[in-house]
From Swiss-Prot:
It comes from the Bacteria. Its EC number is 3.6.1.66. Binds 1 Mg(2+) ion per subunit. Pfam families: Ham1p_like (PF01725). Keywords: Hydrolase, Magnesium, Metal-binding, Nucleotide metabolism, Nucleotide-binding. Substrate binds at residues 11-16, 72, 155-158, 178, 183-184. It catalyses: XTP + H2O = XMP + diphosphate + H(+); dITP + H2O = dIMP + diphosphate + H(+); ITP + H2O = IMP + diphosphate + H(+). GO terms for cellular component: cytosol. It comes from Pseudomonas putida (strain ATCC 47054 / DSM 6125 / CFBP 8728 / NCIMB 11950 / KT2440). This is dITP/XTP pyrophosphatase. Coiled coil: none annotated.
Amino acid sequence: MMNFQQLVLASHNAGKLKELQAMLGHSVQLHSIGEFSQVEPEETGLSFVENAILKARNAARISGLPALADDSGLAVDFLGGAPGIYSARYADGKGDAANNAKLLEALKDVPEAERSAQFVCVLALVRHADDPLPILCEGLWHGRILFEASGDQGFGYDPLFWVPERNCSSADLAPADKNQLSHRARAMALLRKRLGLA
């Protein structure tokens, strides 16, 4: 069991910071990398795992603290796993609304039965920048892509992601519900076990 009282999150995304802090609980204080640097590392990996490790090492190097990185995205089966690791930049960095519009366009004539997808989250935790044994935890959240946006909670692709176990979109879920069901929640549950917090 490892004891981490402070971690730096390798993200400038306030929504992600809030979500992960709620899942971690109060025994660990999560800092944003934005407290140390505004520079985003180049995500040169070809997988969620590679990018999560790269971001965690970069955050540990900049902050001097143990670092937690999340690399997550949406993998749509009909699109061969796209947008995948490019989820945040799917519409050339133009933001959530543009990403959602591009996804709907890509699936324009695709029937409901072929719109299966999963949110993927890989968490990487490093004790220091050169940690030879990062802790890796993966969470998957299976659903499908809607034909139009629904709900106003969450961020990213949440308004387009149908959650079969709740019969609504991810953006229709209250944050507390999402924090129990999501890909990030599943990965975080594994991480909490690894850290002896569960």
